[in-house]
Amino acid sequence: MKPLILSCSQASNKNELDNKYGKYHILNSASLKDGKADAIVKFKNTAKLTEIYNTWLTSFDKETVLVLAHDDVLIRDEQWVEKLEQGLKKYDVVGLAGGINAKITAPCLWHIMCPREDLRGRVSHVVEGSNGSETYVTDFGKQGRVLILDGLFLAFKIKTLLSAEVWFDQTNPCVAHFYDIDFSLTCNKKQLKLGTIPIDAVHNSPGLKKYTDDWLAGQAWFLQKFIDGKY
């Protein structure tokens, strides 16, 4: 069964994605035109990712491999479907970047909580001011098993999560923050293996620019959950 990319976007349609991100967005990813993979974007989305993702877990065949990806991610690796298939033979959930040995403390960003030498994976980014003409690679470290995966790309077989009774926690107050860290730690608690695989993808985002009220509320929620021993 071919993988299914699922993404949420505030844009109204593909034209808006083109205008906002140029060519670097999820619907321009490799393997879509040749039918090796499918993609669905929930446009005009204002709901929390945790709510949408949980709905999707029960909306498709249990054998389906879901790829939950940000709308500003372009998968340009022509062999990503094959690499994903191999990666899911080794790990229960795969991603592009993450880390191990996290020290849970504020600020709760995975690449800060994990020591530099314990980061894994690689992701390309668009050079700011280049109008999309240039990209560069952020090489976090060698590929391998991780404790936490970045939410820009999370892939798994639906039945793996359902069998382990893993869901996205909808008590998370954020629209699009902390769901990935919480999900990753929940997977680990349920004995699922997470790891990064070498898929060439571009994330057309500069990352978190400031700690918004939404983000700070999510951090407080996450830290309390950690203090309460939920992981």
Residue ranges and their predicted role:
Residues 1-28, 39-40:
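N-proximal low-complexity "stem/linker" segments adjacent to membrane-targeting elements
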